[in-house]
Amino acid sequence: MISPMQQVVIAVRKRESDNVITALQDAGVLHLRPIAEGPLSTGNLAGQDAQERREDERLLARAESTIAELGAYRPAPAPLPAQSEWETVVEGAAQPVSHLAKRRQELQSDLEVDRTYGDAVRALARMVGTLDRSRRVALVPFLIGATENLGELDGALRESLGDRYTVASEVVGANRVGVIATLSADRDAARAALSKARLGELRLPGRFDTMPLGAAADELGRVRQGGDDMQRALNAERDRLAQQHGPALYAVRDALKDRVAVHDVRAVSARGKYSLAMQGYVPADRIPALQSTLSRFGDAVSYEVFPVDEHHDQDVPVELKNSGYVTPFQNTVMGLMSLPKYGSFDPTWVVALFVPLFFGIIMADIGYGLLFLAFGMWLLGKARRNEGWDLSLFGAYLPPATLRDLGFVTNVMAGWTILWGFLTGEFFGTLFEHLGVFYMNNDLLNRLWGWTGVHWGAHAAEGGHSTGLLPIVFPRLDTENFGNIALVFALCFGILQVLWGWGIRVQQGLKHNDQAHVWEGLAMFGGVGALILLGFISKAGADFGALSNFGDWRVLLMILGFVLFIVGYLRVAKQFPLLPVELVSQGGSVVSYARIFAVGLVSAILAKLCTDLGWSLSQQIGFLGIILGIVIGALLHFFVLALTLIGHILQPIRLHMVEFLNPTGFNNETSPRYAPLRRLSPASDAGQVK
């Protein structure tokens, strides 16, 4: 649900404003809204206030850049030094850290030069010998393809220099490196000849550019030989500095952020000569905390709390407040979506119910479900040990709280996958069918699904694996008999959610007294429902004559739906002239849910192929075939799962983001996230802004 908000206006004496703002930081409940106009000063600070803000921001930037250069995660909390020592603490860490960062950068640059040019420079040094120390001889190195001819270069040099040059070359890796030796006075002519031959001079980057080739080769040799050890030593030095300065740096950084936040509050408030006024929003259940905070200041503070007008107030922040089962989905899956508009519909619980259900229908494999369950339990184990997950390959770090939510969501999805795996009879594809655990019971299938007009053969042998322990009740791999049933089953979710979405549109329109959206929702609800009935009555276009059977209640309901669409469209034609086009589009939205069947069937077929290949090897080659079958089958399953898993996760999320939430109006408007003013540093140690 969306937490109900209350709007707050606070007026405070200017001399008490710093203490009040600091107390509001401690309370951590007020979401500030800028005051943009009025008789009092608003906007950027000026004078002494602006100077103090610039100084605090400068020191904060210095602290944050130092922490970034240290590459340290937040350590355990440390005491905050006295405010007078903050600059000393920051500069005391920044100077050695910046010097170390410069050395690390230079070493990294040298290692990169050696990786790129090292072999070529050593080859050039061998070719020129001691000529690179001669004052009379100029050396012009160059690079050319290993298979290219030097004839064009030789012709250009002979034309420019006559016989006052020599060229040597050597193949190095995929290229050929060469050098022109000529008189110092002819250096520019040799370079011009290189350009004429469409070649460029080989110039080394950085400090190596001015070195003789022999000296550069020796230096790059030292870099190659000792570079890794030097890098480890520098990294160890960085770790030592992080342990030495990190705790105090983080403490000062947090305190500086709090001070800058105080300046920010001033900037978004209305300022007079003797007073300061601010406005914002507080969740209704946290009003007592705000009142308790402000009551300590007596008559130095005056405030008023009044309800938010959810129909007309703009920029009211949103805080989603769900509990129990829904919360992990709010913190993970809903993070991929925008926030709902304040006063509208919170779809978190719908997502929490249907996304794992759809994922389970798509995967529907006990083996895969057990793998997901193991992964989810591993995530929960790390969270219980208060360990994070460093995904440095992706430049991310997942804290324990995030792992706890991800582990819960993964386990729910695994549970649905295992449940549907029992219904489809799939364990890593058809492995349990081969082992005689699952089997096709035609009599049972006829009793379950015969009402649809589908009939499985009277003899059990016609059903494939005819004996076993557990019967298959949702045989999606039997596409000949069950394909249409599975497809319609998937489309039923589309019918439910698309109509539900337009029903929410009507409900929200009534709630906000928005007649245009009420009639739009009614028109689309009736039109989409009529299209669905048209498809069922005509059997997907195979029997249009049934549409004229007015004795069928479904035909009358279909006509009522089209009438409702026409009436609704006439009421909102000016606002929504393309509503008939949208109606066709919404029919497509219902059909989009067929991907639950289609993607799931592809997943099942791929898993079946992987298992059948491994099983056939085990049957044909004997004991060695069993080993090969297990290894090859496992590798193929891993490969298929790695290629398709992301798509299987995203498909249910997409269905909710587009097909379900578009009709509700969820994607049309959003509200800012509730971000209350909070303190980062300990309340007792924070310095006051003067």
UniProtKB/Swiss-Prot annotation:
What UniProt keywords apply to this chain's record, in alphabetical order?
Cell membrane, Hydrogen ion transport, Ion transport, Membrane, Transmembrane, Transmembrane helix, Transport
| Claim: Transferase is one of the keywords in the record | no
Which InterPro entries does the record match to this protein?
A: V-ATPase_116kDa_su, V_ATPase_I_N
Q: Does the keyword Cytoplasm apply?
A: no
Q: Where in the cell is it found?
A: Cell membrane
S-S bonds: none
UniProt GO BP: vacuolar acidification
One GO cellular component term noted in the UniProt record for this chain: proton-transporting V-type ATPase, V0 domain
Q: What is the superkingdom listed in this entry's lineage?
A: Bacteria
- State which residue ranges cross the membrane: 353-373, 412-432, 484-504, 518-538, 550-570, 587-607, 621-641
Membrane topology for this entry? Multi-pass membrane protein
Main function: Produces ATP from ADP in the presence of a proton gradient across the membrane.
* Assigned protein family: Belongs to the V-ATPase 116 kDa subunit family.
Q: Which PANTHER family match?
A: V-TYPE PROTON ATPASE SUBUNIT A (PTHR11629:SF63), VACUOLAR PROTON ATPASES (PTHR11629)
Q: What is the protein name for this chain?
A: V-type ATP synthase subunit I
